[in-house]
Amino acid sequence: MSKDFILAVDQGTTSSRAIIFDKKGNIRKIAQKEFTQIYPKSGWVEHDAMEIWGTQSGVMREALEFGRVKPDQIAAIGITNQRETVVVWDKETGDPVYNAIVWQCRRTSSICDEIKRDPQFVKYIKENTGLVVDAYFSGTKVKWILDNVEGAREKANAGKLLMGTIDTWLIWNLTRGKVHATDYSNASRTMLFNINSLEWDKKILDYLNIPESMLPEVKNSSEVFGVTDSHTLGGAEIPIAGVAGDQHAALFGHCCFEKGMAKNTYGTGCFALMNVGDKPVYSDEGLLTTIAWAENGKPTYALEGSVFIAGAVIQWIRDGLGLVRSAEDSEYYATKIDSTNGVYLVPAFVGLGTPYWDMYARGTIVGITRDTKREHIIRAALEAIAYQAKDVLECMKEDTGLDLAGLRVDGGAVQNNFLMQFQSDILQSEISKPKINEITGLGAVFLAGLAVGFWKDKQELKSILTTEKVFEPQKDSQAVAHDYRGWKKAVERSKAWAEC
């Protein structure tokens, strides 16, 4: 049977998805299922790792069935995943010892504060992992599990526990425990991986008291990791041939193969990445240095700005405040008024990411008067997404010395034309939206397809992408500067709110 399709496994923060692509990049079928968000305490966020696997395996089978594609027609599987979220499980039983601790979770802030008391070690972490010390990353989450789950430390020291980011957890289950591996992009998000020597950093592991025996093998982003177990997908042994964290996969899906090319993904969070080539660039502006992907043992590096809350603020005004009935309604209400009338909403629900890195910042609405209506709050929530993206992209310009020559965008929120136009205005730059909005999944299948020869080279990948719409700035630079000053003032009000 001919291998006409590639399956993207897209495991996100709020849902598990499976997308079947053909050779022209067309989508044959998408299946999606949401799963439970667990909030045990304020600032804590967890997922049930078994529910993640259950929903993910379920949507894979659903996509094949309703897409009328047989497992034998799948040339390869590409995995892309929510990053930093980490699972620790029993090597023998495959059972997690605790829920997955999600990237948004702030429970390890006190551990990070302890690390920050040693400036030399903080410097070592930045220079060798490319990251800042923050509860966002996997390393301190693993330490917390080992220190707080009964018996976990003893089992880990005895070599009985394994850890991994979500890609590793899925690969383990897809292969029924035959493969314990991750890729360079996901490894670079743990705060445990040395992006210069390209190996797990023993000094950091020792500091956090994490046994190296727990850690997965690190492989190229485009490489055959193994094959699915015959019991997993209808008896077929399908190569798992592409793996990348969601934002890295999106950069690859946008075909940002050249140095200086950038993209922004608008999902639960908001993430901008710029390809900086084959050597890491370290930021003075609060950006992260990360591995975008690796091929043949050679990494491509990127600068990244991470915004914790983007699309999630629209979920909040829908579910938490009841201001809209659907996310789509937000555009309607935002366009009923000409401005926010001086209202700013800073969605620092779990702190602030780039460039502020304030774990203790909290959400703030400022500028409210007796005339403030729900439309102003809704519009301010949308504008906050664009302002946060501008914060990040301004830092990239400072670190690289490059002006932003257009931005490629993807994610659910790019369907909101008001947001995209406001983003173009506030950046004073062109915004390009591709016809294929499933860029993250596309990046995963591009990586997998190259590994198995489904596509011959990157030039062929570029021919698959086409632009749907280009947004041009419609607001003058002086007005933009005035509005942005207001945003920066609002951010200052939100800082250090939850500090002990």
From Swiss-Prot:
GO CC aspect terms: cytosol
Keyword tags: ATP-binding, Glycerol metabolism, Kinase, Nucleotide-binding, Transferase
Binding of ADP, residues: T13, R17, T268, G311, G412, N416
GO MF entry, a single one: ATP binding
Inhibition and activation profile: Inhibited by fructose 1,6-bisphosphate (FBP).
Residues where sn-glycerol 3-phosphate binds: T13, R83, E84, Y136, D246
Keyword Kinase: yes
Record-listed E.C. numbers: 2.7.1.30
Full protein name: Glycerol kinase
Organism listed in the record: Francisella tularensis subsp. novicida (strain U112)
